Amino acid sequence: MSTAAAVRPTRATSVGAAVDALRAHGLRVTNPRRVLLDALYAAEQPQTAEALAGDADVASVYRNLDAFESVGLVRHLHLGHGPGRYALRERGAWAACEACGRHASLPAAAVTRLRLLVREATGLDAGFDHFPILGLCPECANVH
């Protein structure tokens, strides 16, 4: 597990708030970082670094994503098979279909209830930040 999983999430509901958060953590806000923030806030689904990069250098995008993750703005997650993806931490947990790969964000209230159930059953304070809750979507469940 990465050390970023232990980082407290930074609440930033806009690019401007994210810029302020980066500066508050002593990070410079360069034009490539601002462009990357714009892409993250525009994305409705978690994105690969390659998709976020566009015409930018992918290695630079990875370095900037690591910086964003270190201050709690972004998280790296795996949604089933395929490359890792990045999403804003405040966008919550995800569920993914093991058969077709479709994924959806989970409502915060549902995740809170799930965490309580896991804690009651096991004593474990479960986190759903890095991996999705896996299952079959309705279409794939009908096929299998």
Language-model regions, residue ranges each:
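Short coil turns linking two alpha-helices in DNA-binding domains
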Residues: 57-58
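Short alpha-helical segments that sit at the start of domains
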Residues: 3-35
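Long C-terminal interaction/binding lobes of large macromolecular proteins
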Residues: 3, 40-41, 54
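Positively charged, polyanion-binding regions of nucleic-acid-associated proteins
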Residues: 33-43
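Non-DNA-binding regulatory cores of transcription-related proteins
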Residues: 71-144
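Basic amphipathic alpha-helical segments that dock to polyanions
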Residues: 61-72
